[in-house]
Structures are given as C-alpha cells and as structure tokens.
C-alpha cells in the first residue's frame, strides 16, 4: 500500500502538467457518483438498513455498524459512505500523504458517495436471523466493505461490522464526556469524539510482534460485538452513546444464536482465524485474502476446529502466506481454499467500485476481472459455505460448485507455485 501511494503522490503533484490526472478527474466526476460509479446494492430479497452502535465512554467499549433487514422505506436516505473528515485524515496518514492534500482529494473523489443501505431505517422483525461479524483490514474501518455487508444483509443476515481500536484502522474514535459538560446534559450532547489514528511501525520495531498483539485485541473486539448483539437480542437495554433515531428494542429475539459466523479481509482474515480459535459460538469463518503474519504459533498448535473458507485474490498472495493457510486447513474437508482469477487485494473493499478504469487500474483498486463479477463470486461462495455450515434452509446451495473452485473465473486452491525452492 505504501508503494502504491508513493506513485499516487507523484501523480497528484504533477496534476496540472499531466493529461492522465486531468482525464482521471474527469472520469471520476465530483464524488465519483456523476459517472455512475456506485457501490452495488444487495441482490437478495430484503431491503437493507444500517446504523451505528457505540457503547462505553472509553476505547475499551464496542463500536460497530449493523447492517440489517429493513422495512422497505423509500423515504429514508442512503447512508454516507465515509461519515467524517477525520477518516480522510487517517487514510492520508496511513498512505503517507499530507493530511491537507489527502483530505481534499478524498473529499473531491468520494465525498458524495453513499452506500445503498438506508440510514436508521426501521428494522424488519418477525423471525430469528443468522449473525455475521465482520472484521476490516489494515488501514480500513467499519464502512468500506459495505458491498459485502449489504449483500449478506439482503440475503437474510444481520451483519455487525466492527471498527477496531487497536490502532490498525486508518481512524476511529470513542466518545468521552466533555470536560465542561453539565451533570444534567443528556447522554449524547455531553460527549465529544476522541480520535485514534493508525499507528505506524516505530524504528527497529518488529512488525510480527505488533500485529500479533493487535490481532489478539481484534479478536476480543469481535467477541465483544457478538456479546453486545446477543445482549440486545435477549431484551437487555443497551445505551448507545451515539445520537441515533434507531430503536434497538426492535431487535429483541432477532438473532438465531445457533447460526453465528465471522468474516474478514486481509488483517481481518487473520482476525477471523484468531476469533475462531477463541470463541466456539462462531460456527464457521470466511477469510478474504487473509494476511497470515499476525496469526500466532499457538493458534497453529491448537488448530481451528470450525469450518473455514479462504477466498483469495490472484495477485496478492505469495507462497509463505499460502503455506500458513494450508497448515491450518490440511486434511480437513471442512476447510476450503479458492482463488478468484483476475482479482487483486482491493477487489474486496468498496474502493474498487467508486473508481473508474484509469484510477482503478493505476492504483491497483481493480483487477482484470470486472469488480462486480469478482464480488459476486466472493459473495455467492460465502453464502453457499454459510448455508452448509450454519444449516440454513435457503437456496444458496446453487453456488456450492464455487466453494469447490468450479466455475468461471474461480479455481480450487491457489495459483501460487508452492514447489520447494532450492
């Protein structure tokens, strides 16, 4: 990612002289939406809403975005994709771009982008739904995997997208009481945001040690999110410190506690593995282009008992990383690996959908495969896997062949040569 943005800075600094940058700006339009670049809507039978939930007044609390089945309320507005300018600043820090420049660029290109989920729309009650906890990648945050989360919600899942506070997110925050707040002020008006930005490696610091420590915290945050949603479903009242019109009481008896899974991308893929090893209530897991460096030796030794699906891109993986995956999955028919042909590491987050061909290819946000086809393969394989291992009574088994790596633009296992090197 760092080398990618070295290239980015060179391009932007030469923007007045470069026909490429002028064309890229025209291609993207104002906010990306004017040229029809949109995050895809869910293809399932259910309308989707989303809302944010934060508990506690310290970094140890929980913060997540819940995607859920909603009543079909056409009057409700779609949700801003990136909700605060501080996320632009965090992305700039992560990508080694001056904050002032990065904030302006992100605001120009994606500032008006929305995700196709209705903000705080009324929850659709009536049955118990399976729950999926989602973990974001390094430098990401809770909102930028909305294409995957919305599709899962449209197919009947509750999806809790965690925002991690281990300093691996580009930016996140917690709410603390204002120093000058009055005792009679309500829960939301008497608080202010305390921002936590991405922490870079310090000089001489070993990355594996830092990432292993972070993945432990990330797994605990996924388990906290699970506990929080189950607490709400049990009817216990939870205080949301964010100002929201959403009525959490409507989620009472909404979770099928026997059908819970965990899913994540990159660093979030490692988080999936750690979460499975620590929490048996996660019945299965899906790791998207997992980055295995953070996974501890103890996890390999104790192994992961639950079913696990690795969905990899063609261009990101390397032999040592794949061999670590195979160490977890060897001789277990409930652990699968597939690779999406023509895909790149950024084929899973939303950035691939809000960039045009020039920006997308130059910054490796797009692969050779159409982004919509890549995400469909990912989502369909995931749904088929979840149906089997959560014992769902749906029709997702029509995509079972994808889990075995059979179909257009998908292969079983990996494209990486694993032959021993001399």
UniProtKB/Swiss-Prot annotation:
It is an enzyme of class 3 (hydrolase). It comes from the Eukaryota. It is found in: Secreted, Extracellular space. GO terms for cellular component: extracellular region. Keywords: Glycoprotein, Hydrolase, Lipid degradation, Lipid metabolism, Secreted, Signal. It holds the Pfam family PAF-AH_p_II. Glycans are attached at residue 331. Belongs to the AB hydrolase superfamily. Lipase family. The active site is at residues 266, 289, 345. PROSITE patterns: LIPASE_SER. PANTHER family: PLATELET-ACTIVATING FACTOR ACETYLHYDROLASE (PTHR10272:SF12). Modulates the action of platelet-activating factor (PAF) by hydrolyzing the sn-2 ester bond to yield the biologically inactive lyso-PAF. Has a specificity for substrates with a short residue at the sn-2 position. It is inactive against long-chain phospholipids. Plasma. Its EC number is 3.1.1.47. One of its GO terms (biological process) is lipid catabolic process. This is Platelet-activating factor acetylhydrolase. One of its GO terms (molecular function) is 1-alkyl-2-acetylglycerophosphocholine esterase activity.
């Amino acid at each position: 990612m760092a080398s990618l943005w070295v290239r980015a800075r060179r391009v932007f600094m030469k923007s007045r002289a470069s026909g490429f940058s002028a064309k890229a700006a025209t291609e993207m339009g104002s906010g990306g939406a004017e040229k029809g670049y949109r995050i895809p809507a869910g293809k399932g039978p259910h309308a989707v809403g989303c809302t944010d939930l934060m508990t506690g007044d310290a970094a140890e609390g929980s913060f997540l975005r819940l995607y859920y089945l909603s009543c079909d309320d056409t009057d409700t507005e779609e949700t801003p994709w990136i909700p605060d300018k501080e996320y632009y600043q965090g992305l700039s820090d992560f990508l080694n771009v001056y904050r002032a420049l990065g904030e302006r660029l992100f605001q120009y290109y994606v500032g008006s982008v929305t995700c196709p989920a209705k903000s705080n729309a009324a929850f659709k009650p009536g049955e118990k739904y399976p729950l999926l906890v989602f973990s974001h990648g390094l430098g990401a945050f809770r909102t930028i995997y909305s294409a995957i989360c919305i599709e899962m919600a449209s197919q009947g899942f509750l999806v809790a997208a965690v925002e991690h506070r281990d300093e691996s997110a580009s930016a996140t925050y917690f709410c603390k009481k204002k120093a000058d707040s009055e005792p009679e002020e309500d829960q939301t008006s008497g608080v202010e945001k305390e921002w936590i930005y991405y922490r870079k490696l310090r000089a001489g610091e070993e990355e594996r040690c830092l990432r292993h420590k972070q993945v432990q915290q990330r797994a605990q945050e996924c388990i906290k999110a699970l506990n929080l949603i189950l607490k709400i479903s049990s009817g216990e009242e939870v205080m949301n410190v964010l100002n929201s019109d959403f009525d959490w009481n409507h989620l009472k008896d909404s979770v099928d506690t026997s059908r819970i899974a965990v899913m994540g991308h990159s660093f979030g893929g490692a988080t999936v593995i750690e979460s499975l090893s620590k929490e048996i209530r996660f019945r299965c897991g899906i790791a998207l282009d997992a980055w295995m460096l953070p996974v501890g030796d103890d996890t390999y030794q104790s192994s992961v008992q639950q079913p696990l699906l690795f969905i990899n891109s063609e261009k990101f993986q390397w032999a040592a990383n794949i061999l670590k995956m195979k160490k977890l999955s060897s001789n277990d028919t409930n652990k699968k690996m597939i690779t999406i042909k023509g895909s790149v590491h950024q084929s899973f987050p939303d950035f691939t959908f809000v960039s045009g061909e020039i920006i997308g290819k130059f910054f490796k946000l797009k692969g050779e495969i159409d982004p919509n086809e890549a995400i469909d393969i990912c989502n369909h394989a995931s749904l088929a896997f979840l149906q089997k291992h959560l014992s769902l009574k749906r029709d997702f088994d029509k995509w079972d062949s994808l889990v075995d790596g059979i179909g257009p633009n998908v292969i079983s296992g990996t494209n990486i040569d694993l032959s021993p090197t001399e």
